[in-house]
Amino acid sequence: MRQIQIQKPGGLENLKLENVDAPSLANDEVLMKIHASSLNYHDLMVALGLIPTDDKRVPLSDGAGEILEVGSDVTKWKIGDKVMSVCFPNWVDGPPKYELLSFIGDNEDGYAAEVIAIKETALTKIPDNLSFSEAATLPCAGLTAWRALVDEGNLKKDETVLVQGTGGVSIFALQLAKCMGAKVIATSSSEEKLAKLKELGLSLIHI
C-alpha cells in the first residue's frame, strides 16, 4: 500500500510517496480504507517542519473512509461502516487535559495513506447525507468554527458575525452562522473567494 511520509528535516521537497506493508491490527484497533482527506494549515506547518515530528511521519489530521477489518476487542464498529476522524482521538470525554490532546498527523501518523490502523475511539460515524469528501472537512475546520460560534460565542439569531478571511474555518463559520439566523460580514483580499462567499449567503463584504 502507499502512504505519504515527511522525511527529516521537513519541507515540501521532503514529502515522499512510499510503498509500505499494510499495517498490523491491535485488538482495540480497526483497519480503515481512506477515501478522502482534507488539508488544514496545521498540515502545512507539519510538512514544512514547523511542528516537530518523528522522521517518516505520515501527515494529515482529517480523513474519512470505511472499516475493512476490526480487532477482537472492538465493539463500536463493524466491517463496512463509514467513519471519519476526530481531532483529539485520546480525548473521549471529560475535561480536555493536556496529556489527552495528542494530535493526529504530528504526534501520531495521520490520514495520508491508502489504509491505516487506528483505535476505534479515534473515529466517529459519517452522517448519512454526507460524502466522504464532505465528511473529511469537518473534524478540524468545522468543529473549530462550531466551538467559536456556539460553545464560546453563544451565538443567537439576528446577531452579527465578522468572519476574517476565506479559509476553511471562515467558510464553515459563515455557513453555520447563516443557519443560526445571524448576519455575516466577511473580509478577504480575493475577489474569486468573495464570489464564492456570495453564493453561500454572505450579507456584507469588505475587501
Residue ranges, per PLM feature:
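Residue-level signal for nonpolar/aromatic packing positions in well-ordered secondary structure
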Residues: 3, 65-67, 80, 126, ...
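Glycine-rich beta-strand-centered segment in the early N-terminal region that forms part
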Residues: 21-37, 47-92, 110, 127-129
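Alpha-helix/helix-capping structural signal
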Residues: 37-39, 72, 121, 143
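NAD(P)H dinucleotide-binding glycine-rich loop of Rossmann-like/cofactor-binding domains
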Residues: 87-164
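Short N-terminal binding/cap micro-motifs at the start of the first secondary-structure element
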Residues: 11-15, 41-43
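Mid-domain Rossmann-like dinucleotide-binding core that forms the NAD(H)/NADP(H) cofactor-binding site
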Residues: 83, 133-205
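Conserved hydrophobic/aromatic beta-strand scaffold that supports enzyme active sites
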Residues: 17-22, 64-66, 115-117, 123, ...
